[in-house]
Regions:
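Non-ligating segments of multi-cofactor redox enzymes
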Residues: 1-483
Length: 483
């Protein structure tokens, strides 16, 4: 057992309101510069929809992630032959039209235009070429809230029954916030010929070494989530850095800090690195349970001892015990990885959203009178859609999570209204009263330090006296002849 620690984020899709505050805060901090205009390390997508870049989930086109080759994994579009043939050209990489041509407006024309009969306007121009754009063709959330659109929603690869968006009674919508998943088996790192992408041992964050990156762009093609971008100005790859300068000092990510709905939970998970490859080899519908089997109980003395042998500090072990992420992912099995069938073992997890009852199934008030639990097939968001999105097609794990969420609501409704609740409601969902109240607090009134349990980085524990003895005064001696 090789115990490692990873900083992980969980998203509660039931609480996301699609305000894009997280995207704007991330953009203003990290990608507000030339060459990065089209980069959205954090973005929020409307589902069903094509996403950003368009149809990123369609791996038949983009060929990202891993596939099983006998008893081993191999990159879907990579190998010695394809790597050599595509060294200077990436046929599977998203094109500019799959993103959008970044634009701005000539606001100076509003004040500086010549006098005339027409009101001056701020014309759009390309931030890449500087040329005028007559008609804007796209944006980072171009299909925002268009979940019933035949142009966008119908192209969602997770939507098996396209007819559900044809009728107002059956169409549905939910938001999907996305960042880099900082995977345990990152395809971007495996594909890089220069080995510029690495996964940090201390916290699991995946980063790009800008000094080593040669701009081959294999990482952009290999990442199935398309969260690695190419900076056309610097010629380097860039991606979400999980706000590591903040995380290292015990602060949560900018996206989580600014989240209006407080949908994000950040904490430490301990996992068994020896089992990652075997977990990624499982069948699609077994991947969620395989992922969960990798996560270790931080309260287990054997796990704690193994973590200490690998340099995990007591501060991190204490944070792992208090982690809300462990509670949601492992203890209660509510959170699941996004598209585990890509086999990168992503370490960002999502709690599936509840949804209203379909009106086509009858009178809603009769169906739900006095706390009656609705049948899962009557929920507006199809189980199959959520399974395609979060569990590799495994309906059972989605149903188990939804049953717990529904039972939690029924129980807390009874608590708040002082109504009797049948204990079997919680028992059948695998919960008890104490567990229900823990989850209720975590989902509703939990404070900042409950939702974000982030220990400061271990490197700060080094004795300053020893550091001073080995570092000296830091004076750079010049050789003769240097000025």
């Amino acid at each position: 057992m090789d115990v490692r620690a990873q900083i992980v984020m969980v998203f509660n899709l039931d609480k996301c309101i699609g305000c894009h505050t997280c995207s704007i805060s991330c953009k203003n901090i990290w990608t507000d510069r030339k060459g990065a205009e089209y980069m959205w390390w954090n973005n929020v997508e409307t589902k069903p929809g094509v996403g950003y870049p368009k149809q990123w989930e369609n791996q038949e086109r983009f060929k990202g992630g891993w596939v099983v080759d006998g008893s081993k994994l191999k990159l879907k579009a990579m190998g010695k032959g394809p790597t050599l043939a595509n060294m200077f050209f990436q046929p599977n990489m998203p094109k500019m039209e799959d993103y959008y041509e970044p634009f701005d407006f000539d606001y100076g024309n509003l004040a500086g235009a010549k006098e005339g009969d027409d009101q001056p306007v701020a014309e759009a121009f390309s931030q890449i070429s500087g040329k005028k754009i007559d008609e804007i063709q796209g944006g980072p959330n171009w299909d925002d809230d268009l979940s019933g659109s035949q142009i966008y929603a119908a192209k969602d690869s997770n939507l098996q029954d396209k007819q559900v968006i044809d009728s107002y009674d059956s169409m549905f919508m939910q938001y999907l916030p996305r960042i880099c998943n900082h995977c345990l088996n990152p395809a971007c790192a495996a594909s890089c010929p220069s080995r510029a992408i690495y996964k940090r041992g201390e916290d699991g964050i995946v980063l790009v070494d800008q000094e080593v990156c040669k701009g081959w762009r294999f990482c952009t093609s290999a990442c199935p989530y398309k969260k690695v971008y190419f900076n056309w100005q610097s010629g380097k790859a860039e991606k979400c850095i999980f706000c590591y300068p903040r995380v290292e000092t015990g602060q949560c990510n900018a996206c989580a800090h600014s989240c209006v709905g407080r949908i994000r939970y950040v904490g430490v998970l301990l996992y068994d690195a020896d089992g990652v490859e075997a977990a990624a080899l499982k069948k699609d519908d077994e991947l969620v349970e395989a992922h969960r089997s990798l996560i270790l109980d931080p309260s287990d003395p054997a796990v704690a001892e193994g973590a200490r042998k690998n340099g995990v500090s007591d501060q991190w072990l204490e944070a792992a015990v208090k982690s809300p992420v462990y509670t949601l992912v492992k203890e209660f099995g509510l959170a699941m990885p996004l598209h585990p069938e890509f086999r990168t073992v992503p370490m960002a997890y999502y709690i599936p959203s509840l949804s209203p009852v379909l009106s086509v199934w009858g009178d809603t008030h009769k169906l739900l009178e006095h706390g009656m639990i609705p049948a899962l097939e009557t929920l507006r968001v199809p189980i199959g859609y959520l399974a395609s999105l979060l569990s590799g097609g495994n309906h059972r794990v989605i149903e188990e999570a939804l049953k717990k969420l529904i039972a939690l609501r029924v129980f807390m409704r009874g608590e708040n209204l002082k109504l009797p609740v049948d204990p079997a409601v919680l028992q059948e969902a695998g919960l008890d009263e104490a567990a229900a109240k823990r989850l209720y607090r975590l989902f509703t009134v939990a404070g900042y330090n409950e939702r974000n349990v982030i220990p400061a980085q271990q490197r700060e524990m080094q004795d300053p006296q020893k550091r001073r003895q080995t570092a000296g005064f830091g004076i750079l001696k010049k050789t003769r002849g240097d000025k």
